[in-house]
Every structure is written in structure tokens, then in C-alpha cells.
């Protein structure tokens, strides 16, 4: 019996367990104190009573209004951000004037003796290049006193071919290829500079992606599978007029055009024909009439034409536009793109001679398997290799229309500059006050090696990156 009674004592709740834990902690302390009635009343008023200490608090879901943030300035106007993003600064008055810097003359870019030298662009050519948007925001024009260019061996080779084509009435069709920041866009700028100084007519598309990424208006052409882009065409006509006004002022019309927005008699100034495009709706008709006038055969005074485009890969694919059946439109079905690809492939002949140049890009560029294959094939044929690259039989990314355009073009591959050209560039940077080191053989070899054997953009990054605004 005693054992059962002991077991009952073990399971019976003890008096100590019924005491709250807080009271045990307070009572078990070694400190003893007394409190007056006033202190006890204040304590109970502050804590709400000891009996309510363990009660759960109620959650309050009261919505609090956020304070309105007062704007410190007005929002940017429409187009202001884009204008700031595309802003081009071509001079810096704080930079030192380079002593002995010569200005380019019409034949300087085609002279072999000028390889490795830096020459300044004439002011009228700078205005024309700015009108055609040949300068890029990523180029470091704004840290020098005036815009100048380095004459490379590829520059001389290209301008010599342009000079011969203009004299013989032939057309060179070339694609400028190269790795990132090797100077492809700058070589296009030098070709345009040579054309402006020798009284050529220059038509330039600065960003091919603006034609194919569905960022501009488009409309179908009646009785044709092609599509026009009236707003972009009007903008192109206006920039073409500003850049070539000196040459166009000496030319008159030789054909009558019935579809123009206004009547233009025969033998009228060609500028009057361009000025007739006041609205976007009639821009494509005016552009067709202008192209016909510029390519008039057996007409004295018709200059050669330079037709150039930057960002070639963007037009060598299916565009982002859609037809009424919601099918994607191929880039070669856009009228402006079709004109350039016909000139590049040789389907459209320019009787007065000239050049058709397209430059590839590595920044923000889509992959075009057919274009890359065609470039590799043309380079293999030029090198005389027995095995020419062929299509991947398991890939469906090839485009017959792209390969037809690139079938007979010439490829100019840009690589790094030579050490002689690198020395001329570094000496110009040092004379401008941008390079605070002595230019000698060891320094030239160091910069040339660090830049991947003379890649111009990497040389700029290694030497002038801290000087950029």
C-alpha cells in the first residue's frame, strides 16, 4: 500500500508548479525591497495590471496612408531622354591644341605616306557627318580639342578603291567585319569623309536596328509586296539634304515625276524636289524620284554615290513587323532595306559609280547564321583555301535570301592597329594632354600588348578611361 501511495504522490500536481514563472523569478531573488502604495498604483497603471501581462495583444490592421513625395523638378519632356542619350560632344576647350596638327585634304586618306598619322577633320565635313549621324555616343570625341582621325592601312586601301571606282564608273560592294571595338564604325566615318571631300553624294543609315525592330511606323505599298516606313524616310531625306546641300545645289532634275506631292518641272533644282516632301505620307515617293535622278545615265555632273549602313546583322533576319495576317515580315520586304540589299548584292546598279558599304557590329547585335557563313565563305575564297565552310545540315537557322545578298560581296576584316599606327595615336593623345606618360618604344609595346595586339577600343580603355566624362 505504501508503494501505491508514493506513486500517487508522483503524479499529483505539486503546489510549486501552480505558481506563475514570473512570481518564481521575482520571489526567488536575493533582493528584498518595499514599495509604497503610490508606487504600486503607478506601476499598475503603466503595465495595465499584472494579471493582463500574459494576455495576447490584438493585431490592428489599420491602413496608414503614405506621405506624398513632393517632386523637386518637372518631368522630362517627350524625347528629352533620347536626345540626352544620343548627345554628341565633338570638342573640349580645356584640351590642349595639338601643335602641327594638319587638316585633312581631299586626297590625304588615300596616300600611303599618311599611314600612322592623325589629321583633323574639316569643319564643313564635321557638320555633314553630324547631319548624317556618323558620330557615335560611345566614341571619345569630347575629350579632345577638335575631332581627328587616325589614318590606318585599311583606310588607305578602302579610299583607294573608292577613288578608282569613282573614276571608272564602277561600284565596290564591301562588308566591314571585325571584332568588338576594332573601329568598324570609325572606318565608315572615314569613308564618308573621303566622299564628302571629293564631292560624292552620301546616303547613310546610322542604325539599322531602327528599321527592323518595329519602332517606327510602316505601311504597305499598293500593288507591291514591299512595305514603306514613311516617318523614317522623311527623316532620312532631311538629313540627306543637310549633309549634301553643297553638291545637290549644282544639280537639276532631268525627269518628270507625276506622283510627287507637288509638281516639279523638268530642269528644276534637285533641292526643290527634296523640299517637296513636307509630310511623311509622300516621303517614299519623293525618295524614289530622288534615287532615280541621282542614278540618271549619261547626264553630266552626276557624282558617284556612297550608300552605307551600320549594324548589318539587323537587316539580315526576319524583322519584328507583322502583316495583317499577323505573320512576321522579312527585313528584305521593307522598301529601304530592299534598296540597300539590292545595291549590296549588285542587283541594282549605280551607273555613275560609287560604293556600297555595310559594317557589322558586336554590341546589341542579333545572330545571323547565313551572314556569318557567307563572310566565312568569302574569306576562305579570298585566301584560296580548298575547303570552303558549308551549312550545318542539322540547323534550320539559314536564310536563302541573306545568302543571295552576300554571295559576291568583298570582305574587309578589321584587326588591331600596327605598332607604328599605335605610336601615332599615343603621341596624339599625349600632345592633347590626355596621356601623362612619355611615349617611347617600351610604352608603345606595353599598350599595344595590353590592348590585344592593338585593338583601338582596348587601347582607349587602358589609357583614356579615367579621362572620359
Curated annotation (Swiss-Prot):
* Amino-acid positions noted as binding ATP in the UniProt annotation, renumbered to this chain: 150
The answer to keyword Mitochondrion applying to this record is yes
Q: Which UniProt keywords apply?
A: Mitochondrion, Ribonucleoprotein, Ribosomal protein, Transit peptide
Q: Which Gene Ontology MF annotations are present?
A: structural constituent of ribosome
Instruction: Show the disulfide pairing.
Output: none
Subcellular localization, as worded in the UniProt entry: Mitochondrion
Where is the chain membrane-spanning? none
From which domain of life does this come? Eukaryota
Q: What is its main location?
A: mitochondrion
Keyword Metal-binding attributed: no
A Gene Ontology biological process noted in the UniProt record is: mitochondrial translation
Task: Show which residues constitute the signal peptide.
Answer: none
Q: Which GO terms describe its cellular component?
A: mitochondrial small ribosomal subunit
Coiled coil regions, renumbered to chain: none
Q: Fetch the Pfam families from UniProt.
A: DAP3
**What is this protein's function?**
Component of the mitochondrial ribosome (mitoribosome), a dedicated translation machinery responsible for the synthesis of mitochondrial genome-encoded proteins, including at least some of the essential transmembrane subunits of the mitochondrial respiratory chain. The mitoribosomes are attached to the mitochondrial inner membrane and translation products are cotranslationally integrated into the membrane.
Subunit structure, interactors included: Component of the mitochondrial small ribosomal subunit (mt-SSU). Mature N.crassa 74S mitochondrial ribosomes consist of a small (37S) and a large (54S) subunit. The 37S small subunit contains a 16S ribosomal RNA (16S mt-rRNA) and 32 different proteins. The 54S large subunit contains a 23S rRNA (23S mt-rRNA) and 42 different proteins.
Q: Which family does it belong to?
A: Belongs to the mitochondrion-specific ribosomal protein mS29 family.
The protein's name: Small ribosomal subunit protein mS29
Q: What species is this protein from?
A: Neurospora crassa (strain ATCC 24698 / 74-OR23-1A / CBS 708.71 / DSM 1257 / FGSC 987)
Q: Please state the gene responsible for encoding this protein.
A: rsm23
Amino acid at each position: 500500500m505504501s508503494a501505491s501511495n508514493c506513486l500517487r504522490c508522483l503524479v499529483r500536481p505539486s503546489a510549486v508548479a501552480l505558481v506563475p514563472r514570473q512570481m518564481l523569478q521575482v520571489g526567488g531573488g536575493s533582493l528584498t525591497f518595499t514599495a509604497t502604495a503610490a508606487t504600486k498604483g503607478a506601476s499598475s497603471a503603466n503595465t495595465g495590471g499584472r494579471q493582463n501581462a500574459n494576455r495576447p495583444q490584438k493585431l490592428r490592421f489599420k491602413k496608414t496612408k503614405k506621405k506624398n513625395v513632393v517632386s523637386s523638378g518637372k518631368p522630362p519632356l517627350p524625347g528629352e531622354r533620347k536626345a540626352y542619350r544620343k548627345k554628341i560632344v565633338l570638342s573640349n576647350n580645356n584640351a590642349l591644341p595639338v601643335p602641327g596638327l594638319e587638316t585633312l585634304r581631299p586626297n590625304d586618306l588615300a596616300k600611303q605616306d599618311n599611314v600612322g598619322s592623325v589629321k583633323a577633320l574639316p569643319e564643313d565635313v564635321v557638320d555633314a557627318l553630324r547631319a548624317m549621324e556618323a558620330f557615335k555616343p560611345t566614341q571619345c570625341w569630347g575629350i579632345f580639342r577638335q575631332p581627328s582621325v587616325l589614318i590606318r592601312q585599311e583606310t588607305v586601301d578602302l579610299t583607294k578603291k573608292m577613288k578608282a571606282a569613282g573614276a571608272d564608273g564602277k561600284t565596290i560592294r564591301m562588308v566591314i567585319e571585325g571584332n568588338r571595338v576594332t573601329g568598324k564604325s570609325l572606318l565608315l566615318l572615314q569613308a564618308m569623309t573621303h566622299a564628302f571631300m571629293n564631292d560624292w553624294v552620301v546616303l547613310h543609315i546610322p542604325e539599322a536596328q531602327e528599321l527592323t525592330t518595329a519602332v517606327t511606323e510602316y505601311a504597305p505599298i499598293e500593288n507591291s509586296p514591299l512595305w514603306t516606313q514613311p516617318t523614317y524616310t522623311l527623316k532620312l531625306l532631311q538629313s540627306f539634304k543637310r549633309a549634301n546641300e553643297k553638291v545637290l545645289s549644282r544639280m537639276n532634275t532631268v525627269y518628270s515625276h507625276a506622283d510627287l506631292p507637288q509638281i516639279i518641272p523638268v530642269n528644276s533644282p534637285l533641292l526643290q524636289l527634296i523640299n517637296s516632301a513636307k509630310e511623311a505620307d509622300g516621303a517614299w515617293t519623293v525618295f524614289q524620284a530622288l534615287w532615280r535622278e541621282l542614278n540618271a545615265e549619261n547626264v553630266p555632273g552626276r557624282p558617284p554615290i556612297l550608300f552605307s549602313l551600320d549594324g548589318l546583322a539587323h537587316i539580315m533576319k526576319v524583322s519584328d513587323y507583322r502583316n495583317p495576317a499577323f505573320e512576321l515580315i522579312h527585313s528584305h520586304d521593307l522598301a529601304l532595306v530592299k534598296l540597300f540589299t539590292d545595291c549590296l548584292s549588285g542587283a541594282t546598279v549605280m551607273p555613275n559609280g560609287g560604293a556600297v558599304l555595310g559594317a557589322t557590329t558586336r554590341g546589341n547585335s542579333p545572330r545571323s547564321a547565313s551572314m556569318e557563313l557567307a563572310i566565312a565563305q568569302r574569306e576562305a575564297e579570298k585566301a584560296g583555301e580548298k575547303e570552303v565552310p558549308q551549312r550545318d545540315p542539322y540547323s534550320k537557322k539559314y536564310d536563302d535570301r541573306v545568302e543571295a545578298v552576300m554571295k559576291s560581296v568583298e570582305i574587309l576584316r578589321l584587326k588591331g592597329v600596327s605598332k607604328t599606327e599605335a605610336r601615332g595615336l599615343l603621341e596624339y593623345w599625349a600632345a592633347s594632354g590626355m596621356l601623362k606618360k612619355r611615349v617611347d618604344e617600351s610604352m608603345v609595346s606595353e599598350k599595344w600588348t595590353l590592348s590585344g595586339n592593338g585593338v583601338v577600343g582596348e587601347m582607349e580603355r587602358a589609357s583614356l578611361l579615367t579621362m572620359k566624362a
